Amino acid sequence: PCIYQNALIYDYILNADNPNSQIIKYLVNRGAKFEVHDEGYSGRTPMHFWARRNNYQLLELAIKGGANVDMQTFSKLRKCNNETLLFEAVSEPETYRVTQLLIELGANVNFATPTTPLDDAKGSRNKKLLKDAGAMTSEQIRKKFNLPAYDSSHCEIDGKTDMDLLGKYHDEYSKLLNDAIKKAKESE
């Protein structure tokens, strides 16, 4: 059984127009990390929904209580992690407060999927916050570390994209970018 769909508290968190912060605080105090992913295509956690809905108060409670500021979605289909909370935050121009909070709490502004939050950012405030925090586009990362260009043309078979092959290439290229960033940080 899916713990996510069967847990009433997660149903409440996702469906309440304005989740009660006292309930979230109670859960945090009891060790909740909110690392339960939905079983749908997106694989989001409650925190991803809060980021998209601009609910920075609940995100702050959860992260300061021990939840991962770089929590990723989990694709059940590809069995891999993907976008962090920051991707959700920058997907809407009006969620700049969430973007600012995540950056202040240490979110990785250059996490690549292979796109980065700066590649996907909507709204001038989100873009400025990211740039001020040292964010780069995936193309800037590629050039800075002299990495090969993203080319998924080999993922086509008989004129159609093989989604499994594309997914694997996508993941490998993301890892290449993320490893380059990690290595650069370690040598600082």
Specify the residue positions occupied by each region the protein language model found:
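Ankyrin repeat domain, specifically the short helix-to-loop turn at the C-terminus of the second helix
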Residues: 1, 25-34, 60-69, 100-108, ...
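Ankyrin-repeat boundary/"N-cap" motif
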Residues: 1-15, 36-49, 72-90, 111-120, ...
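Residues marking helix boundaries in flexible regions
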Residues: 4, 10, 14, 24-25, ...
